[in-house]
């Protein structure tokens, strides 16, 4: 396993934290984007280090998540997320790279492949549900109170009961990494306004620079070679979604693995194996 390094890079009004593995200058590097909800780069340490034997692998915390800072302008737009990819890869001095994204990162990596096809060698989609945007939360977009629980166990409890629980709900050590101890209790390291896609303040009047398209349509525009790794027990891929994906994208190989939605936790070896075979000697 490759040793971990940590770094930061500025992007717009945030400071992005990232974990890096492997030596620069090897084969085509890989950027891994974690999902939304209760994931961050911590969940990808094992997979990233295993993939970094012959190349550099970087996995950042999304803006507003984990050790990355919250956006003062509450800008969690698609433009901002694509700019963050550009900022991280510029910071580590990459030209072309392989892009992998899990869960709510799926729409972002697909959009990046459409908008910046010359930057990518290959695309790895990991259990990203196709018929919803996991970042599109309902309700108030800004001014939401932070999530605070009296104990670590209280924070874990509701997520442990989910049909497809994240590691946060099952692993106390992992949960601690995602929480900050405050006078009121344990606060989640995530901006409660992370679903806001319209910046406030000076950036509010700026037009979007890139279209946000329906996900099925946008994936059909991708020219970069791609694969889908999905969990056989994942609630993101019911039979009707698998059927539609197979029909509409016969050119994108699917690799089902014995896992629920949290593929990097439940099927890391299978994910690593399929990824290595797909990227080959690139």
Question: Whereabouts are the PLM-identified features?
Answer:
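Alpha/beta-hydrolase fold catalytic core
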Residues: 1-32, 53-55, 94-95, 250-253, ...
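Conserved HGGG/HGGXW glycine-rich cap/lid loop of the alpha/beta-hydrolase fold
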Residues: 14-70
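Conserved catalytic-core motifs of eukaryotic protein kinase domains, centered on the activation segment
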Residues: 42-44, 68-74, 134-137, 239-240
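Active-site loop/oxyanion-hole signature of alpha/beta-hydrolase fold enzymes
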Residues: 45, 49, 53, 58-100, ...
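Flexible "cap/lid" loop of the alpha/beta hydrolase fold
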Residues: 110-114, 121-154
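Conserved alpha/beta-hydrolase catalytic His-Asp/Glu region
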Residues: 150-203, 209
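Conserved serine/cysteine hydrolase catalytic core
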Residues: 182-248, 258
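Catalytic histidine-centered segment of alpha/beta-hydrolase-like enzymes
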Residues: 259-272
């Amino acid at each position: 396993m490759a040793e971990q390094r940590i770094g930061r890079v500025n992007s717009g009004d945030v400071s992005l934290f990232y974990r890096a593995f492997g030596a620069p200058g090897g084969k085509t590097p890989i950027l891994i984007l974690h999902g939304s909800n209760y994931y961050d780069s911590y969940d990808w340490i094992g997979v990233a280090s295993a993939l970094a034997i012959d190349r550099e692998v970087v996995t950042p915390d999304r803006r507003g998540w984990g050790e990355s800072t919250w956006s003062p302008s509450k800008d969690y737009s698609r433009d901002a997320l694509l700019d963050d990819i550009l900022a991280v890869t510029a910071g580590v001095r990459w030209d072309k790279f392989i892009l992998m994204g899990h869960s709510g990162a799926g729409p972002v990596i697909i959009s990046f492949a459409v908008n910046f096809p010359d930057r990518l060698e290959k695309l790895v989609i990991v259990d990203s549900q196709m018929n919803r945007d996991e970042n599109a939360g309902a309700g108030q977009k800004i001014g939401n109170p932070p999530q605070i629980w009296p104990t670590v166990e209280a924070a874990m409890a509701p997520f442990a009961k989910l049909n497809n629980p994240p590691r946060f709900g099952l692993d106390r050590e992992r949960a601690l990494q995602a929480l900050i101890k405050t006078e009121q209790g344990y606060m989640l390291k995530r901006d409660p306004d992370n679903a806001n896609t319209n910046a406030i303040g000076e950036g509010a009047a700026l037009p979007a620079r890139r279209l946000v398209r329906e996900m099925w349509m946008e994936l059909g525009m991708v020219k970069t070679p791609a694969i889908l790794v999905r969990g056989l027990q994942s609630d993101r891929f019911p039979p009707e979604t698998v059927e539609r994906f197979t029909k509409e994208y016969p050119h994108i190989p699917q690799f089902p693995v014995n896992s629920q939605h949290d593929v990097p936790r439940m099927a890391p070896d299978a994910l690593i194996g399929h990824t290595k075979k797909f990227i080959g000697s690139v």
